[in-house]
């Protein structure tokens, strides 16, 4: 019963966060016609590396998509499960930056796992980078992934900065991340890991 109640509570909070963001987006309905609304939605419930805990980030995609359509978004790109490799995510970001114009509204949503990594450039006080986990990223170093498949906060910053420069100060960039980057934000103990989006295991 406790697990069921936790899942219901978690799903409610996720829906509430998304609802609040969409209400925020609806506030831009009265903007000039030249302003274009673009969205990138990434949702993961399955991973190539099966050692990742079970989550349902892919289920967020249709919910968010439906709300964005109601908010009259012009273009919505979705990457779900095996589509959401690091290469495809980065490509989607770059294409979004390429197509974006001054004053556009950009909405980016990521639902999936997160993980800390050892900081490689010394810009983090705690010595750790946070990262999104694409479909092809592994929890532990292996022949298939030595960390290059993770999407670090440094990389995300570069990708977002490109978009921000294109839309300018008159544009709006909204980023929603439903993931646990360090493994400390959990709703329950290890026996209920199916609702934990992340890991407290650092990628070394």
Language model regions located:
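Boundary at the C-terminal end of the N-terminal hydrophobic targeting segment
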Residues: 32-34
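Glycine- and acidic-residue-enriched helix-capping/strand-helix junction motifs
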Residues: 47-62
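A generic structural signal for short, well-ordered alpha-helical segments in conserved domains
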Residues: 61-65, 76
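Short beta-strand elements in bilobed, periplasmic/extracellular small-molecule ligand-binding domains
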Residues: 70-79
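Bacterial N-terminal signal peptides
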Residues: 15-27
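Conserved beta-strand elements of the Class I
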Residues: 38-40
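Caspase-like (clan CD) cysteine peptidase catalytic core
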Residues: 36, 75, 87-111, 116-188
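N-terminal secretory signal peptides that target proteins for export/translocation
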Residues: 1-14
